[in-house]
């Protein structure tokens, strides 16, 4: 598995070696030893989540201010544009974002450590999105930053207005968001 640190170095893109022939393909989607070697520290996952969304659905930008979650994310059907925003005030990349296309075809995964907000928009007719988390969902600690915050200036690849949940429509401005030390 190839691991590439992105413009925010704590966010890592993983690309598996895929073995294919006329029967189909095989690849190792997760290897704890290789993953922790790339991250540089032990990581323990406690929950897997799976969602299905239609084209234009935008989920995010979500995070938990307590019980902060690291996430290893991938698309198992279709394609998404996946975004991580650094919310760690002490970080040299505080307030910056990175984004990557993840798809069933490219089989890429993105590691988003705790201390980041996360979101994605569906680019294909449908997408199924699978992610591992390092802590359990804690709705009382959940926060949301509005997807189109003018300070963050995320370059979402959108043709039309996204389809948002009520929670995501009510997201806070980055300037007003609870952030990490």
From Swiss-Prot:
InterPro entries referenced in this protein's UniProt entry, alphabetically: RmlC-like, RmlC-like_jellyroll, RmlC_Cupin_sf
Record's catalysed reaction(s): dTDP-4-dehydro-6-deoxy-alpha-D-glucose = dTDP-4-dehydro-beta-L-rhamnose
GO MF annotation list: dTDP-4-dehydrorhamnose 3,5-epimerase activity
CC terms in the record's Gene Ontology section: cytosol
Binding site for substrate: 23, 28, 47-49, 59, 71, 118, 142, 167
Keywords: Carbohydrate metabolism, Isomerase, Lipopolysaccharide biosynthesis
EC number: 5.1.3.13
GO biological process: dTDP-rhamnose biosynthetic process; lipopolysaccharide biosynthetic process; lipopolysaccharide core region biosynthetic process; polysaccharide biosynthetic process
Pfam families cross-referenced by the UniProt entry: dTDP_sugar_isom
Site for Participates in a stacking interaction with the thymidine ring of dTDP-4-oxo-6-deoxyglucose, residues: 137
Quaternary state and interactors: Homodimer.
Family: Belongs to the dTDP-4-dehydrorhamnose 3,5-epimerase family.
Function noted in UniProt: Catalyzes the epimerization of the C3' and C5'positions of dTDP-6-deoxy-D-xylo-4-hexulose, forming dTDP-6-deoxy-L-lyxo-4-hexulose.
PANTHER family named in the record: DTDP-6-DEOXY-D-GLUCOSE-3,5 EPIMERASE (PTHR21047), THYMIDINE DIPHOSPHO-4-KETO-RHAMNOSE 3,5-EPIMERASE (PTHR21047:SF2)
Name of protein: dTDP-4-dehydrorhamnose 3,5-epimerase
UniProt source species: Pseudomonas aeruginosa (strain ATCC 15692 / DSM 22644 / CIP 104116 / JCM 14847 / LMG 12228 / 1C / PRS 101 / PAO1)
């Amino acid at each position: 598995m190839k691991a590439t640190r992105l413009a925010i170095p704590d966010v890592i893109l993983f690309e598996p070696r895929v073995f294919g022939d006329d029967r189909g393909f095989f690849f190792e989607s997760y290897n704890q030893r290789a993953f922790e070697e790339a991250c540089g520290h032990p990581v323990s996952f406690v929950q897997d989540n799976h969602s299905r969304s239609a084209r234009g659905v935008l989920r995010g930008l979500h995070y938990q201010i307590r019980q902060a979650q690291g996430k290893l994310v991938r698309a198992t059907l279709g394609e998404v544009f996946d975004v991580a925003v650094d919310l760690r005030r002490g970080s040299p990349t505080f307030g910056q974002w990175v984004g990557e296309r993840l798809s069933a075809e490219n089989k890429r995964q993105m590691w988003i450590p705790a201390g980041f907000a996360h979101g994605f928009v569906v680019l294909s007719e449908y997408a199924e999105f699978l992610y591992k988390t390092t802590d359990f969902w804690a709705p009382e600690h959940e926060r949301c930053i509005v997807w189109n915050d003018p300070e963050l200036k995320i370059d979402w690849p959108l043709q039309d207005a996204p389809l948002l949940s009520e929670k995501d429509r009510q997201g806070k401005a980055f300037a007003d968001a609870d952030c990490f030390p």
